Amino acid sequence: MIIPEHFLYVLYIVLSTTVSVCSSVYIFSIFYFGRKKERDNHSKNTGNITILIPVYNEDVGLFNRCISSVNKQSTPFIVIGNGCNLPYREIVEDNGGRFVYLRDNVGKKGAMAEGIKRVNSEYVMLLDSDTVIPKNAAKRLIQKFDTETGGVGAEIKIIKDSNKFVYYPSEMLQKLRQLSFKAMSHFGRVLVLNGQCAVYRTGLIRDFILSREFLEPRFLGKKMVIGDDILLTKHINGMGYKTILAQDVIARTKGQGSFKKLVKQSIRWSRSGYINFIKGIKDGSLFKNGFFYSFSMIYVYTLPVLTLFLMVLRGGLLFNIIVRRGILNGGRLFILSFTHIPRILNSVIFPYAGIKIISIISVVTMIYLIIEKTEKNRVRFLSYGSIILLVMFLTAIYAVMSLNNHDKWLTR
């Protein structure tokens, strides 16, 4: 069956207009809600907290920095040696912490399960062994809790690295995530509480962490590899509790050691995100966390696929014009074909152009948001950091195409 060319023009304009409108709404929402100050109505919370840290073959110097920062919190902490003992035990015990040695490497989730059994406090901070937290971070995070809050995450930044092709894209990736999460936090439902540093009510997550649903999650009939942070956040959201991002607590974490590892991390995050998105549609949780949460999820996970489809559609139209009219006139005729649209579309030419102008404004707004709090090397940050945009697009498409291959972690 031959599809009429006019129909393809209509389809292109309708879809591209829809994407432009949704992108503008998303970006302007981030600009408005993400810049609002946090509501300060629960600052008297002083509940007790334990910090739980799984460790596996971590860089000793970085682990030492992590434990030193934890020691300054003046709160109990437990480190689970996941198939590793010295020198981590010495570092932990020298700083007044408790070290639990597991002979076998049971994975991060397994180590978390062993650790949560030993936590008796009202709150628990889950902290990665390569993450450094500021003084009083634990106290400030639990002060964000009210009776309706189940989890609070810290803002994450990347520890500066000499490899600019890894550091700047990694920092850009984190910044894009934080911009979105800040806006979602305003509504009390974030997509992910960053796994590097987040605080939860112990009573809400203890049984879940010990459950098979957390330790051995399944997708498409087989065991899947998915981030513990996505599972925990989805669990808290599903219980009806708020999940929020603390904008005044900044934890710094180690980036990926090479560009190849950064790409693999992006694939893992994308694949985990799509699995969570599909499961959210299947169990209905996608539509139970408020309009902005649902809109953000649908926009973020359909955008790469729609963008690829529009690229293919536009390329097909251009190829068709070149074949019919000749390669020399192809480019000019392709442009003219969108200005001499069939009469049925005459009424949408002006609004279509107006929407494109709004889209340009929204892109400029996004760039402003990205560089707003970048104090140094803004040009370098944008130029090197923008590499991650292409990586995110390509890895998202690859993640969709390889959803069935979800049993490998890819990065450590």
Where are these predicted regions, by residue range?
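N-proximal low-complexity "stem/linker" segments adjacent to membrane-targeting elements
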Residues: 1-68
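Short, solvent-exposed helix-helix connector turns and helix-capping sites enriched
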Residues: 84-86, 288-292, 405
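Membrane-embedded multi-pass helical conduit in multi-pass membrane proteins
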Residues: 9-13, 27, 31-35, 41-44, ...
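Membrane-water interface at loop-to-transmembrane-helix junctions
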Residues: 219, 286-299
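Alpha-helical membrane-protein architecture signal
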Residues: 259, 263, 287-292, 383
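Short hydrophobic helices that act as membrane-entry/anchoring signals
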Residues: 5, 9, 29, 167-182, ...
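Short, charged juxtamembrane terminal tails flanking transmembrane helices
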Residues: 407-412
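Non-transmembrane catalytic domains and loops of membrane-associated enzymes and transporters
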Residues: 47-284
